[in-house]
Amino acid sequence: MSTIKPSVAEKFAEHLPYHRPLAEIESVAVEMGSSPTDDGVVEMIVCRPHTDERRVLDEGVLDVSHGLIGDSWETRGADDGGPDPLRQITVMNSRILASIAGNRDRWQLAGDQLIVDLDLSIASLPAGTRLQIGDAVAEVTEPPHTGCSKFAGRFGADALAWANGPGGRRQRRRGMHVRVLVSGKVRRGDAIRKVA
């Protein structure tokens, strides 16, 4: 398990110097090719214990009531002040993230708990689709996952525009939300697949 925990400025300074321009992001994305549509792999598990803190885990527990155990999801409020069950876990495609972030050491900065090699597009995984993720089962939820100013600060304005543009939204380049239906362990390298 690795943790980024110094001050916010120190923490992200080593990761910030390079923002890929749009042409490079698009070129790398084409070169990376398409992710599988049915049987994918969990590439990275990232816990966010506190704001701007990341822990890369070899194994985690996805819990129906608490999301990723140890993550701060429950403190990231919905409109009513409580946790938003439709935004319990965020999932991002590893090939898309590699196109944007480059070095794997920077992937955790995206802030998504699960980085996976699976086609996350709306056409492939409409809301309501169930996924087996390691020993857990989760359901794709409706709310879009869009990039924010932190994402732009870490990866650049071109990355944010590419992720949030019309094609980006259809492909869910910025990722998607799921909620846990059946608690269970998830490990790096575990399968992620559609449940019939």
State where each predicted segment sits.
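Metal-cofactor-dependent catalytic cores
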Residues: M1-A196
